[in-house]
Each structure stands twice: as structure tokens, then as C-alpha cells.
């Protein structure tokens, strides 16, 4: 089952449902990507920081070799890590990531965080994480404008078909749009019923920037990381509002949460290593929730953010 697409301001079509690669184990990653392609997934959302791009590429290569899919039918996403924000670092690290994936271009290349950290040589440590070689967080003087100018050159050189941002506020987006020669095609943010960020979503969409939600299931992804507010928060899958809608429509709680996003034009990137759930997560566009039901889910908003760099040792708040 193929996912419907959203037209980006770059002119390219992006699947509304993709497969997220954060925390996908290196040992199983190639097989998971391969199986996801067989199940019908075409968008794969990766990143330098996930540390599994080589294995992702192996799964893609196997599927292409077996004739299951062509490269041009895939939508491969990766991200620029914080340690490579200086203008002359952007293209070299993008080329390394392309080589890791075994592809010639990214369909979408995203600035992962609006934070410039001190450069870490990939030969010394890769992925570099948040700390410098000294073992502590150190900042670079690179500006977002410097970084974005280098990102635009990736489009010029056909290394990336579209470029975007992640974890940006409306203020940062507004500033970026004042000087961008190539407008960001997408904004990827944490988005679930406990963190709806309606004004940010509305602003991005009004500016023609597609929104992608990560962590669509709220605290679930952060339990194994022992993030305190995730551990202390009731699971969305067990919330009465979500459960009752799942029963009404004969869907899973996961499908209800994903449909709440996709019905509002927001792309999603769930993952699963379970074949049944893989298929179920793709089936989130052919049926509709009522307007009042969308609003009921949105009313669960608590402003609860689970992916905050403060928890990774960052001492300057970005949200």
C-alpha cells in the first residue's frame, strides 16, 4: 500500500507516511529497512546522529537489487548534525552521509537542530553526539544564515533535492525566510497530543512549509531512555479518548494518533519491526475522524516536550 503524498514548495512529492530510523538497532537495521520497503514504505527518515546510515543503505541496496523498488521511487531523508554547521563543513559531511547510504542524492536534507557545536572530525568520533572532543558541550560561531547558505549549495549541486529544518521555532523560521534563497521545504518537530504546537504548525503551513511530526506516540519512544517526564506521563495508547476512538473505527490506538496528524496535513514517520504494525501504520489516510474528534484529541495538549537537548547535557535552552 503506497502512502499519499504532499507537494513540497520545491516541487517534489513527499510521502505523508514514512519510516523513522531513530533508535533502530544497527544489527537489525538493514533488514528492517528492507522489510519496510517490501511493506510499501517509500520515505525513510535518517540522520547522522542515529549512527545507522550504513545499515540503512544496505537495506535500500538489497531492495533495489532485487527489483522491489527503484531509487527514484524512494524518498530518503537525512540530517545535518550540529557539529557540522560551519559553511565549509556542510558539503563534506553531506557527501559522507550519501556514501554511507550508497546514494547520489538525498530527497530531503534537514538541519537537525538550530544549534552550532564545535567541529568533531568524523575520523575521531562519528557520530559525534553533543560533546566535543574535550567531553563537554562547546559551541561554534556558525550562524544559521551561514549554515543555510551552505545547505542551498547542496541543492545547486544536486546533492539534495529539497532542504528543510527541524526543531526550529516560529521566530527562527521567520528570520530564515528573510534571507533564504531556497526556502525550507519542511519543518520537522515533536508533535503529538501532549505537545500540539498549533501556532507553530499554522505558521509553517501558511508559509508553504510542510510539517513532519516525530514522536507521534508521545512518551512511548522515550521510556527506554528513562526520560523522567516520559516515565511519569500516562501512555497515549491507554488514554480513554484514544482508546474509545480506536474501538469506534476498528483501528489501533497508533492508527488513531497517526490519522489525527495526517488528516491535518502533517506527515508522520513511525517505525515498527512487527509486520502487522508496519502495514497498519501505513493505513492512516483512507478514513477520517470527525472534526469534533480531532479537536478532542488536540485538547489533550499539556505542552509536554520529551525530546529536549537540556536532557542531553545542553545548558542553553532552545525551546
UniProtKB/Swiss-Prot annotation:
PANTHER family recorded: ALDO/KETO REDUCTASE
Transmembrane segments: none
Organism, scientific name: Aspergillus oryzae (strain ATCC 42149 / RIB 40)
Enzyme Commission identifier(s): 1.1.1.307
Family: Belongs to the aldo/keto reductase family.
Protein name (record): Probable NAD(P)H-dependent D-xylose reductase xyl1
UniProt KW keywords: Carbohydrate metabolism, NAD, NADP, Oxidoreductase, Xylose metabolism
A single cellular component GO annotation: extracellular region
Function: Catalyzes the initial reaction in the xylose utilization pathway by reducing D-xylose into xylitol. Xylose is a major component of hemicelluloses such as xylan. Most fungi utilize D-xylose via three enzymatic reactions, xylose reductase (XR), xylitol dehydrogenase (XDH), and xylulokinase, to form xylulose 5-phosphate, which enters pentose phosphate pathway.
EC class: oxidoreductase
Classification via Pfam families: Aldo_ket_red (PF00248)
Chain sites annotated for binding NAD(+): 166-167, 215-224, 271-281
